Regions:
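Bacterial N-terminal signal peptides
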Residues: 6-17
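Beta-strand/loop substructures that line and gate deep hydrophobic ligand-binding cavities in soluble
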Residues: 103-133
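Terminal, regulation- and interaction-focused segments at domain boundaries
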Residues: 22-51, 152-156
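Soluble non-cytosolic domains of exported or imported proteins
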Residues: 30-38, 55, 134-141
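Compact, glycine-rich, soluble single-domain proteins
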Residues: 48, 59-101, 105
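Extracytoplasmic/secreted envelope proteins and their assembly/folding machinery
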Residues: 37-40, 44, 61, 140, ...
Length: 156
């Protein structure tokens, strides 16, 4: 009986890191009913509809394949706010280590597709503070609303 419990716990802990990373405070993680590719396209379309621009995509699985490694799909979409971003980066140059914002579209070992973003609260209370700046409550509220709408559009 103890062996069965031990094996069961070991199997649970094997999958724990992926589950914990998806529920980390400061992250918005939503399951997508679409493929990785379609979720990326839907995210990009939705974020552009809010006035943001797409700078690039980083396909981690494609990069791994170049070295003969296999990886589940994981693509980072780098996007930004052309109205506010450049001025803030000029004033707070170290912010560029964290900005522009990114979205991660990924597939887990069970085949489920997920979208993960940093939350508005995380940007306000961690990223901006880290670089000696802040954002107004109105800006954070708008960002929170934008991220919620965009993530819903991309995944539902």
């Amino acid at each position: 009986m103890n062996r069965v419990i031990g094996v069961t716990l070991a199997v649970c802990f094997l999958f724990l890191p992926q589950t914990v990373s998806a529920e980390e405070p400061g992250l918005i993680t939503k399951p997508s009913k679409y493929s990785v590719t379609k979720t990326i396209k839907r995210f990009e379309s939705a974020i552009q509809g809010k006035g943001y621009v797409i700078f690039t995509e980083i396909d981690h699985a494609a990069a791994a394949a170049k070295f003969g490694l296999q990886s589940l799909p994981r693509t980072v979409v780098v996007y930004g706010d052309p109205k506010n971003g450049p001025a803030r980066l000029q004033q707070f140059p170290t912010l560029a280590i964290d900005a522009p914002p990114k979205a991660l579209v990924w597939q887990d070992a069970q085949g489920a597709v997920w979208l993960t973003l940093n939350s508005a609260e995380y940007w306000a209370n961690h990223v901006y503070k880290r670089h000696g700046t802040s954002a107004s409550a109105d800006f954070i509220k708008k960002l929170e609303k934008d991220l919620e709408e965009v993530s819903d559009t991309a995944t539902k």
